[in-house]
Amino acid sequence: MFRRDLRRWAAEGLSYLTLDADVKEKLMEDEGAIKALIELAKAEKNEDCAYGVVTLLVNVTNSFEKQEIMPEMLELAKFAKHHIPQEHELDDEDFVDKRIWTLGEWGITSALVAFYKNDSQNIQELIARVLNAVCKFTELRGFVVQQGGSKALAALALEGTEKGKRHAAQGLARIGITQDPAIAFPGNRVSKKTLLEI
């Protein structure tokens, strides 16, 4: 029991720390730590560590929504001499893409698949965001399908938050463009009703 709690706390602590781009890069240098998180997700398959692991992955892949700052607010902040947060150079697209690519190769989809049946719609949305980010890369879509990601995305596209459904549908569309449907969606016939729901 204590060991399980310790793992959960470690995952939640790392999820908070990965808001910092320097920590994201340091974590990505430690393949063992990432693989331990994947194994934790596959072993636990419960809500205890789901939030920490999935939030960490959202932070590392920058799959969260970025708030747009209106130009008027920017000018007002400058006038008031208020600090305006700048995006960290390690959160540039090249660095983020490299992190997503590495996570995809290391099998992060299997960790997300372990959690997709979670009752929390917020966790489901976060899973859809990360899977969609991995599906951005044509070469990784095969890994996503092999590890059960297309099945998870299909389920997430039909239930959960609107944003979660949208991300899941986009991930499915990306898979559908490049993968053989008989392989990506075995045994599933997509009905017109399902397509309209998505």
List each model region and its residues.
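Buried hydrophobic core positions in alpha-solenoid tandem helical repeats
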Residues: 1, 36-38, 99, 108-116, ...
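Alpha-helical solenoid repeats of the armadillo/HEAT superfamily
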Residues: 1-19, 26-29, 45-72, 118-136, ...
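Acidic, Ser/Thr- and Gly/Pro-rich intrinsically disordered linkers and low-complexity segments
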Residues: 1-2, 45, 89-93, 112-116
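Alpha-helical solenoid scaffolds in large eukaryotic transport, assembly, and signaling factors
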Residues: 21-26, 33, 38, 100, ...
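Short sequence/structural elements of tandem HEAT/ARM alpha-solenoid repeats
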Residues: 26-32, 69-75, 102-110, 114, ...
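Acidic, serine/threonine- and proline-enriched intrinsically disordered linkers and terminal tails
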Residues: 54-111
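Register-specific detector for alpha-helical tandem repeat solenoids, activating on a conserved position
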Residues: 110-113, 132, 142, 154, ...
